[in-house]
Amino acid sequence: MRFAYIEQYDGKLSQGELCRFLEVTDRGYRAWRPRPISQRQRDDMVILAHIREQHRLSVGSYGRPRMTEELQEQGLAVGHRRVGRLMQQNGIKVVRTHKCKATTDSAHNLNVAPNLLDQDFTATAPNQKWAGDISYIWTHQGWLYLAVIIDLYSRRVVGWAVSNKMKKDLAIRALEMAVNLRQPPEGCIHHTDRGSQYCSHDYQKLLKRYGFKASMSGKGNCYDNAMVETFFKTLKAELVWRQPWHIRRQCELALFQYINGFYNPRRRHSALGYKSPVTFERKAA
């Protein structure tokens, strides 16, 4: 209260006289008096607002490197240290991933393709190597199964489908979406696990019709299809595990928005120079 009185009459009487009259020290008053905001503090406030917005748009997936790339692309002059400091000071944390269970049904007598990929996930152009797999999401209506096809060149999801049953038709619909979208040339490697959906006669017949080279993982080796496993871990951490799903349709709409509205066009990958799959393909064209 005394400090506020000094501030009110400062200028009309000397600060020293007011302090002596009210029995307070000059140092105490200076420590209490609000200091003007510096330009750097103002800049921090602007940067923090952008960080909060990108944290929301990225569903909490961007740590310091990706966040810095995003802000720099927007024209902000920021570095990794400043972004990291502001995120730490304001409790802005990254969503962590968890291990996923396998859904492979390999207890069958169907033919299995050789492992052409052999854990070489690199490609020099789109439509050289594709990989597919199936995962599952729990809803209050029961399981929802998700099949995806990913282009290993850009990590882009080029085909996907959902169903309440993990049958071959689910995998076939994801493949047909990918083929219709990309029109891959003959000889594209198509890699999956040994699941019965992918080993089925109908699925293998489609692969031959479209000119794919079929490739399958070794028995029980999840690392042979690590790229798709990584996508599922990311999807579940950034979307699936963050809320309960009451009906399958609700989850399906959210998957559509995540894949087509965020993951493909916006989500940055360190392996792609912190570019999104769509941007990486566009700049490489």
Where are these regions (language model features)?
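Charged DNA-binding/catalytic regions of mobile-element recombinases
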Residues: 1-285
